[in-house]
Amino acid sequence: TTVGGADTGYEWDHPALKQKYRGYKATLDTFDHNYNWHDAIHVPDTHHIDVGNPCGMDSQEPCDDQGHGTHTMGTMIGSEGDNQIGVAPDAQWCACRNMERGYGTPFTYIECFEWFLAPTDLNNENPDPLRAPHVINNSWGCPPTEGCNPDNFELMNIVVNNLRAAGIVVVVSAGNDGSGCGSVYTPAAIYDGSFSVGATRPNDTIVGFSSRGPVWVDGSNRLKPNVCAPGTGVRSS
């Protein structure tokens, strides 16, 4: 199973992630980022006064400019020998950076979704749908401050539906805007085609910050999230 991650980037050579990175060839101790990594960050985000990003723009290798992506990937597949911190330690991963230090746009989010449909080489050429991941994790939301609003919700919805039609499961965080009703309000958690996940405490109660349904923002009254899972005090990379 291959897990695709879309986030702030990933520290691919982290001890808990390196052996599971699809681009790493353990027998030769070499790596190939073609078809395994894409950077959708081409310009600095306007939320930041400074323009210095530790990963730069259009990074040719997996890089995490904030740390959030590395943590989420460890939660999914992290494993270092007997030190298995992920829930699917036998899976491998590929990735796309869709946020610049925690901020994205509809364009960066959609670009990563489209890349996962048919991953390309580092020149963004020769797309190959046979290298698409089986599931994509998205621990982010696109609020109005990033440019998502009811007028353009359908753009990302089309891409999510295309991924589902290709047999790819789109997993999305329900959001951290709880605890009121209707607080699942950002793409891609709001869509029928996404599998959105809320957060629980160790005692199986819902965490206060975890967003609740139903989805009111688009008038659908859709029941979300689909499931809940541990979301606090999670040991990861």
Q: Predicted segment positions?
A:
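Glycine-rich, acidic and aromatic/proline-enriched surface loops and short helix-turn segments
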Residues: 78, 115-118, 138, 229-233
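Short acidic, glycine-rich surface-loop motifs adjacent to enzyme active sites
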Residues: 116-151, 173-174
